[in-house]
Amino acid sequence: MDDAARFHHVSVRLVHAIATVESGQHANVVHLNTDGSTDIGLMQINSRWLTTLSRFGISRSDLHDRCTNAYVGAWILSQNLHRLGLNWDAVGAYNAGTRGKRMAYARRVYRTLNMTPPLSSMPAAPRTTQQPGLIAKLLRPLTWEGNQ
């Protein structure tokens, strides 16, 4: 997660907080939403992103890889921050479309950030990428296509 956050120029602590809120930092979590979409993995990448991600060779099964999922999640967050500015609305947009839901989500992330110890006291996460080539696909600049 740390490398993904740094690569996409977003806060490492913020990415950790979002992963905690989304999945409890568990890579194998899959959640079926009431609208029929699915949230996948560590950063709970919504299945609506699959069309965009497929253009870069990233499939649904690739999102089960912790490292790939972290890079995609950090990229989504960076796009929100670029589009909406460095504010809590952009953080909330990671999870929700409407302003009220965005703010409720952002408050959860904020509370999690306040409970998270400084990164220097956190143990390093294990590197578990099974397919390092997938990360190379994410290292190319991705363009925002208004997805989500």
How should each PLM-predicted stretch be described?
Residues 1-127:
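Catalytic glycan-binding domains that act on GlcNAc-containing polysaccharides
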Residues 123-148:
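Intrinsically disordered, low-complexity charged/polar segments
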